């Protein structure tokens, strides 16, 4: 029987045992976190192809008393300029227009298919969990070329309010932590479900590019987008229904195809410099912003603030060094 002082130190054995215990705990935590993140309830939203559809009933105008009541109810939670903007884009006083202010998806699901050719929700998307589910549900309820109006508080407004609320230096520290919590965690595979289970999707931070990109991904065409107060309002037209709408998660890296010698296609990695869902905005950006020299857009809303700096300094290209290994 050996003694601790002969060949082994009791402290070495204790250290090894603790290291193995810590590794086992980390492994079990990672294993269960991975299973939790898979979220078995999050299944892709599939839809069969549908025949061309028109609104079910001919439109009629509301009675004057109903028009006044609708105006008063809308002005209780929004400004008159918002009401005028909505009036400009849809006939809000038509029996074929449905208006609501709700974060509950049930209020959309219960609507008869193709009963309304315009749906307006005054509840900011920042307060709604399952934005893609909302968009696809609206898509299913609208007839062909139906109009969908929604609103959200853009990330730029959230940033401005935080920087104004706190003193210098502290405001930037708070904003960086806030950004990591509200923008980074919801987009990562391992933390996305945990984030939404804790916050229930309330007070989300959404960029303009992400909201417009989600709409295009879910089969809408952007007709107009205006800032009214602290909220951005988007008017979109239903164009098609994607066969499958899946949850999309984004990491810090993006994998791209490149063509090399003799036409050989290979993969390269870069740091992500664009907002989520930006890949669905190519046509929208092309239609609204002209190209500058070099084939880039004059005002590309898809690129993040950090991404502009990374592109300017070529930092986003650093992961391509892996191709040399």
List each language-model region with its residue ranges.
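Hydrophobic alpha-helical transmembrane segments
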Residues: 2-19
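A short acidic, Gly/Pro-enriched loop at the edge of an enzyme's catalytic core
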Residues: 106-118
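A short SAM/SAH-binding and catalytic strip from SAM-dependent methyltransferases
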Residues: 115-135, 154
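A short glycine-rich, Lys/Arg-flanked "PGG" loop and its adjoining helix->strand segment in the class I
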Residues: 132-147
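Conserved beta-strand signature within the Rossmann-like core of class I S-adenosyl-L-methionine
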Residues: 144-158
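C-terminal alpha-helical "lid/dimerization" subdomain adjacent to the S-adenosyl-L-methionine
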Residues: 157, 161-212
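Core SAM-dependent methyltransferase catalytic element
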Residues: 212-247
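Conserved small/aromatic sequence motifs within transmembrane helices
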Residues: 240-325
């Amino acid at each position: 029987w050996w003694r601790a002082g002969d060949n082994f130190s009791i402290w070495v054995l204790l250290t090894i045992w603790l290291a193995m215990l810590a590794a086992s705990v980390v492994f079990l935590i990672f294993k269960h976190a991975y299973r939790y993140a898979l979220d078995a309830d999050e299944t892709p939203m599939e839809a069969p192809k549908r025949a061309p559809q028109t609104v079910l009933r001919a439109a009629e105008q509301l009675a004057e008393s109903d028009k006044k009541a609708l105006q008063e109810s809308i002005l209780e939670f929004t400004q008159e300029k918002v009401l005028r903007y909505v009036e400009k884009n849809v006939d809000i006083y038509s029996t074929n227009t449905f208006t609501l202010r709700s974060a509950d998806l049930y209020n959309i699901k219960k609507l008869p298919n193709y009963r309304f050719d315009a749906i307006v929700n005054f509840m900011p998307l920042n307060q709604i969990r399952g934005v893609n589910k909302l968009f696809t549900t609206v898509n299913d309820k609208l007839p062909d070329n139906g109009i969908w109006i929604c609103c959200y508080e853009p990330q730029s407004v959230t940033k401005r309010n935080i920087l104004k609320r706190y003193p210098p230096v502290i405001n930037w520290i708070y904003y960086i932590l806030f950004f990591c919590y509200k923008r980074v965690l919801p987009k990562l595979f391992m933390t996305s479900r945990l984030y939404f289970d804790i916050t229930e999707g309330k007070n989300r931070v959404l960029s303009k590019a992400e909201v417009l990109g989600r709409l295009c991904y879910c089969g809408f065409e952007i007709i107009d987008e205006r800032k009214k107060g602290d909220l951005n309002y988007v008017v979109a037209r239903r164009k098609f229904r994607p066969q499958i709408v899946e949850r999309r998660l984004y990491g810090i890296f993006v994998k791209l195809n490149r063509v090399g010698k003799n036409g050989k296609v290979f993969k390269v990695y870069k740091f992500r410099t664009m907002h989520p869902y930006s890949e669905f905005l190519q046509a929208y950006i092309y239609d609204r912003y002209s190209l500058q020299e070099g084939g880039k857009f004059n005002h590309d809303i898809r690129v993040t603030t950090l991404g502009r700096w990374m592109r300017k300094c070529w930092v986003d290209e650093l992961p391509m060094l892996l191709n040399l290994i």
